[in-house]
Each structure stands twice: as structure tokens, then as C-alpha cells.
């Protein structure tokens, strides 16, 4: 069975950026030693590289959205705990998805089945260190025990410093629409000839195929499922506002959870961003900093140019943003890459969003 209909490429934002930690303790891992707070790490060869999970990073985005004044979905006390699953009212349910398989909001089983599970609009990697862990530990004491007449409880916390990398893909086509917004599902359509389906109302179909007839498996008939109808999807203006809110939360990203004990800055210091069609991860593995000039924090324009050429048919627009107080000013006179200061780069991305949502 194959889809023979016309495919429309998804449009989205692909963003890879670097964070600089002077000293910090990313999301915690499992420890077999009492009173030792360890960092999550992944091993390559003989070296361990600290990271913060993508779940922790999405939590930080949620908390930042809340700090920017957006209404966040409350937690429902069930097993397992979940959000209320209302993407119309709550921006995080729209952007980060939810699973509410037993939803009975509309009373129509087929619609509730699709609306009960929403795939995340935002795909995100963990925040991964570019340098290995060097066994640095901070020592402290829990002085609360003194108030109870006991002794201070000593503890240790693994700490790290260096450059970290994270990547996101934001499916702009699905913000404010799709699962969670569905109000009607048309019945499947059949025809004696698949060509009848292809030449009639093609844009209304989600899937078109040739399938065996129930009574005679040797006889093929046309079969089509209609696109699910979202009559209560958000307006283009509201969809733009949510995309812009997510962009702002990246720009002002603040830590959550245990990282509140270590005041760190998770905002982009060097960023490669692209408005893409289909190419979701053009810079995910690209070394944005030039390894040959690590002490100077030089942008690796050659690597970015290579990714740009590799995904040329999937990248519609590209911008590189940098913090001039941390990254050496690049020489782009003879380079076709659009390099801007960080604020200007985010303004450029905002222009892409306005164009996408026709604002």
C-alpha cells in the first residue's frame, strides 16, 4: 500500500546553538554513592561528556514561557501525571504535545481518539557538552540539621564548565492545528479506479492507495482517507503569536529544577538557524566553533557552508547569530552566509515567522 497523492513538505525552523557554562551542574543522574549529586553523562571511548536531557530542556522552555506571562497547562494528578491536554487554551499542550488516550471530551470515539494524543510540535536534542568531564566536585553542607539539634550533613555535587550544544526542530505547519483541534472526520472514500480519486478533490485527501476489494483480493479498488477537519484551529495571527512566544523562550531560556541552585545562562551564544522545508536537522552535528582556534571562539563558517550546500534544496533561508562579547567577530566579506549579531538574528527569524503565517 502506498500513498500516491501529492506530498506537501513540512515547513519549520531548524535551530542549533551553543551555550557557555562558566560553572554548573546539568540535570542529575543516578548515583551509587550517598550524598553525591552526579551529572548525567554519556561515554565515548575513555571520556564522559555531561548533558542535560531533552526532557529537562523542554521543562526549562515551559518554565520560561510561564515566566514570560503565558498560561501553562496545569498538571492532572493521575497515574502517570499529565497535563490537561487542551492545546486550544494552553500553549505548552500545543507545542510539546500530550497523551490522553482515554479522552472523552466530545463523546465521539473516533474524534476523541485523534484528539487524545498530540505529537510534539517541538523536537529537541539533549544539551550536550563539547568537552569531557574532568572530575570536578563542589563540597557543601546541609545546615538544616543544626536547627533540629543534629550535625550538618555534608554532600558533594559534580560540576562542569565549557561549551554545550542543543538543537531544535519546530514544525510550524502544526502549531495551532492538527490533533487536539479536530472537530470532524469524514468517512473513507472508495472508487472503482484510483485515478478517479486522484483527479477529484486531491487536496482533501490525507492518504490515497490501491487496495484489494474485500470479496475479491485480485480486484484492486481506489481507497482514500480524508484529511481530518479542524474547524476550531487557531487563527494565523494566534499561531504566529505562539511561534513567536517559543522563539522568545529560546532567546531568554532559563534553567529549572536542580539548576536553580547554580545560576547559569542557557541563552544562545552562537546560533545557526534555518527556515526549512523537510530538512529538519541541517546543523545538528555541525561544529559551529572552529576547533583549530578554540581559544579565540571563532565561528566555523566552512562547516556551516558545507551544511548549507548539503541541504541546499531543503533550506529556504539561513542566518547565523553570535554574541559579540563571547564570539570573535567573523570576517564575512567574501562569504555568502548571513551572519548577524544575536538580536538581529532573532529579528530575522521573526520575519520568517510573519511570512510563514502571512502576518
Show which residues each predicted segment covers.
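RNA-binding basic/glycine-rich loop and surface signature characteristic of RAMP-family CRISPR effectors
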Residues: 1-359
Amino acid at each position: 500500500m502506498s500513498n500516491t497523492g501529492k506530498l506537501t513538505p513540512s515547513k519549520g525552523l531548524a535551530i542549533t546553538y551553543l551555550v557557555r557554562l562558566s560553572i554548573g551542574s546539568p540535570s542529575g543522574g543516578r548515583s551509587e554513592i550517598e550524598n553525591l549529586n552526579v551529572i548525567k553523562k554519556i561515554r565515548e571511548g575513555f571520556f564522559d561528556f555531561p548533558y542535560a536531557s531533552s526532557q529537562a530542556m523542554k521543562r526549562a522552555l515551559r518554565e520560561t514561557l510561564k515566566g514570560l506571562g503565558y498560561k501553562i497547562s496545569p498538571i492532572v494528578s493521575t497515574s502517570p501525571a499529565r497535563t490537561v491536554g487542551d492545546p486550544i487554551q494552553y500553549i505548552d499542550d500545543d507545542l510539546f504535545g500530550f497523551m490522553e488516550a482515554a479522552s472523552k471530551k466530545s463523546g465521539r470515539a473516533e474524534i476523541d481518539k485523534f484528539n487524545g494524543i498530540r505529537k510534539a510540535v517541538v523536537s529537541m536534542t539533549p544539551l550536550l557538552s563539547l568537552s569531557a568531564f574532568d572530575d570536578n566536585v563542589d563540597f557543601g553542607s546541609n545546615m538544616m540539621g543544626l536547627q533540629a539539634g543534629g550535625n550538618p550533613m555534608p554532600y558533594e555535587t559534580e560540576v562542569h564548565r565549557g561549551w554545550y550544544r542543543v538543537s531544535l526542530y519546530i514544525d510550524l505547519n502544526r502549531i495551532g492545528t492538527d490533533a487536539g483541534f479536530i472537530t470532524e472526520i469524514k468517512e473513507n472514500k472508495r472508487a472503482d479506479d484510483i485515478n478517479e480519486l486522484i483527479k477529484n478533490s486531491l487536496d482533501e485527501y490525507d492518504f490515497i492507495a490501491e487496495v484489494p476489494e474485500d470479496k475479491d483480493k485480485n480486484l484492486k479498488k481506489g481507497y482514500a482517507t480524508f484529511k481530518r477537519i479542524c474547524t476550531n484551529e487557531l487563527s494565523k495571527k494566534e499561531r504566529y503569536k505562539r511561534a513567536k512566544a517559543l522563539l522568545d523562550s529560546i532567546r531568554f531560556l532559563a534553567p529549572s529544577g536542580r539548576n536553580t541552585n547554580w545560576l547559569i545562562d542557557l541563552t544562545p551564544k552562537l546560533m545557526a538557524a534555518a527556515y526549512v522545508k523537510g530538512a529538519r536537522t541541517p546543523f545538528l552535528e555541525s561544529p559551529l566553533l572552529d576547533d583549530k582556534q578554540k581559544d579565540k571562539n571563532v565561528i566555523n563558517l566552512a562547516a556551516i557552508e558545507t551544511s548549507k550546500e548539503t541541504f541546499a534544496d531543503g533550506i529556504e533561508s539561513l542566518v547565523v547569530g553570535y554574541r559579540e562579547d563571547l564570539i570573535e567577530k567573523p570576517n564575512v566579506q567574501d562569504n555568502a552566509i548571513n551572519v548577524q549579531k544575536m538580536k538581529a538574528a532573532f529579528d530575522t527569524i521573526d520575519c520568517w515567522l510573519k511570512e510563514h503565517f502571512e502576518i
